[in-house]
Amino acid sequence: MTDAEQQGLADGRSVRFLIPRRALHGGTGSVAAPRAGESLEFHDYRDYAPGDDLRNLDWNVLARSDREVVKVRREEVAPVIEFFRDKSASMDVPPAKRETSDYLFGLVTSAADGCRVVEREEPRTPRSIRIVVSDLMTDADPERELARVAHLAATVVVIRILSRSEASPETGGSGELVDSETGEKRELALDDKTVSAYLSALSAHTARWRNAARRFNASFVDLLAESPREDVMRELAAAGMLEGRR
């Protein structure tokens, strides 16, 4: 466990992760029942989704109404949080981006009472809460990427982390630009024209991701890697993800 993850775990004890209402009735047996003896207690019904255990299908309801529903047990009510961390090389430039990603994982893990937080490379659990943490420095189509993540999800949160120099580069000087993913090098003058063109491209790129997020009812949160921890928690609270413990 990294130092940033440990700090996130510590800070998460003072806040609570807010579970979206639409995620409260679609868990998949990921957490233990709140008290002994409740593990098989019936709680509610929900619509069948591909991947559900057919043994939980209520055949009586199907016969009466032609509706496919599954029985939800008491221990299945709390949702799974699937956490997706960008592992690409660009997240290490600067290291603060990776550290913020690690901090968020620890923070959510600690703050999400009654949930099981699991790190994934691909979505697996139907009706899970899915959190994507990335700098989004990719040419991939945002709608295609979010369609894959949002499929059968209860809700999706996209958290973009940029360094201060990526979000607002300073003009002046020149240097060698190195692509952290490919190793490609290019001499670049950071004059007003170049920086203006970069900011225009970044704005358009951001708009594409925000529009895709709206289409799939996903939340989009922007963070600066160098921000103090208090500011990070404040941004997540403003996005409806966290609240202080009472």
Language model regions located:
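An amphipathic, basic-hydrophobic helix/alpha-beta surface used to engage anionic
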Residues: 1-121, 129-134, 139-140, 164-167
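Von Willebrand factor type A / integrin I
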Residues: 1-34, 126, 146-246
